Amino acid sequence: MRPWTGSWRWIMLILFAWGTLLFYIGGHLVRDNDHSDHSSRELSKILAKLERLKQQNEDLRRMAESLRIPEGPIDQGPASGRVRALEEQFMKAKEQIENYKKQTKNGPGKDHEILRRRIENGAKELWFFLQSELKKLKNLEGNELQRHADEFLSDLGHHERSIMTDLYYLSQTDGAGDWREKEAKDLTELVQRRITYLQNPKDCSKAKKLVCNINKGCGYGCQLHHVVYCFMIAYGTQRTLALESHNWRYATGGWETVFRPVSETCTDRSGSSTGHWSGEVKDKNVQVVELPIVDSVHPRPPYLPLAVPEDLADRLVRVHGDPAVWWVSQFVKYLIRPQPWLEKEIEEATKKLGFKHPVIGVHVRRTDKVGAEAAFHPIEEYTVHVEEDFQLLARRMQVDKKRVYLATDDPALLKEAKTKYPSYEFISDNSISWSAGLHNRYTENSLRGVILDIHFLSQADFLVCTFSSQVCRVAYEIMQALHPDASANFRSLDDIYYFGGPNAHNQIAIYPHQPRTEGEIPMEPGDIIGVAGNHWDGYPKGVNRKLGRTGLYPSYKVREKIETVKYPTYPEADK
């Protein structure tokens, strides 16, 4: 039997050796930065891996602390298992460090450099093509002008798809695709652990709670977003979300009859003190806080979208094109875990409809939205983007059939679509369209229909819809939880993505701009631009917050401003 003292020294020796290796490889990376033959992309990848090694070092430190017992044998029981786990992690870490040292010497891979040069050349050739074709158009008239313009747009589409395909393959080279898969999975598991920990306190009678009533006066997508908003505030204020859903207008039995409960251990909203939301600080000593709808919450908490957690921001920016949407998707993912009967319904519907890939999801919202919140869009506007998406997919996979999942509240649309586009295979359930009508909307059958529509839309390879629709935005959010980065897998005919009642959506100017027309606004690098909308023509609308002027500006001259907030990190969730 070895005494603990010797083992503890052994642990400390391992940690010291670990730290020395980290210091060595860190210095090695810094020195290598001076060599011109190393790309900044490769260096960023390696530094990120080094950051993960540091995180593993912290994990080892915590493991060593958990092993620190005053006396007694360690060759059996839990302590022995932890020591063995420590040894395994140490050996893996040594192997990883050696691999990363080799990568810094080798530089980017051959495929990476071939693709990078192909994209560079493609961009140049596109510019040459544009210059040449526009000069030709100047000298054409009438039918000849129309014919040449059509050919020009068709060729331009080929150029764009060629560059986009090269960019896709570039994103997969040198292990980048595998890294992205793993990093997205790790981030998702981390957040889901934290949410699960918060939602399942050991003693419900003592837990701080945030009460959210689901029955906001709107449809399913809107109500789901209302609960997501509540959930984010609960997460930020370290309160267990208590969801009140009795007599829900879609299912009188409540949320739990359709989806899994938001908590397994704490479904009772009672507490020693109760009050309405008056701000995180003022509510500090109130056990149960009732939250109003986002439109009337005051003071506004900092945890509203489009902000993301400070401790995850750097990792999210690297792995995902729209971190704010990814963050929303994590709460949606937790909330819509189906009950067994619903899971079975989804499986049966998948087989019955013949849903399989490749497939484009199309959502056409009509009825109450048209004229009130959105314009009418004929099916032709959707299929333009559907065809573009299929042509892009065909460059990297076999498209045996052009499948389109059509979700709509207009029962007549399916027949119209099949008549106008016989080369497409439309997958749709017209009974869902009938149940989505205004007279049938708030029924359990309608709820089943909208859940199925959202599920299949989120499963599609691309999504074509109007972001003015909550159903479309929910499908897009779920899509983000299914892929490492599906932020670009959409075409919206109207709005950009937004979350109802959020904090401002801002961008930062990276290039100067002098207006050429009366409707444009000037910009200087560093100016904050508040986004008001996007016309999908290269010129969004926004306000220059420094000048107070509203107008159009070139989208390529700005970048997204990622808003971060100091969310709690719930270290207890990892124990």
UniProtKB/Swiss-Prot annotation:
GO terms for molecular function: alpha-(1->6)-fucosyltransferase activity; glycoprotein 6-alpha-L-fucosyltransferase activity; glycosyltransferase activity; SH3 domain binding. It comes from Sus scrofa. Catalyzes the addition of fucose in alpha 1-6 linkage to the first GlcNAc residue, next to the peptide chains in N-glycans. Residues 206-493 form the GT23 domain. Signal peptide: none annotated. Belongs to the glycosyltransferase 23 family. PANTHER family: ALPHA- 1,6 -FUCOSYLTRANSFERASE, ALPHA-(1,6)-FUCOSYLTRANSFERASE. This is Alpha-(1,6)-fucosyltransferase. The lineage of its organism: Eukaryota, Metazoa, Chordata, Craniata, Vertebrata. The gene is FUT8.
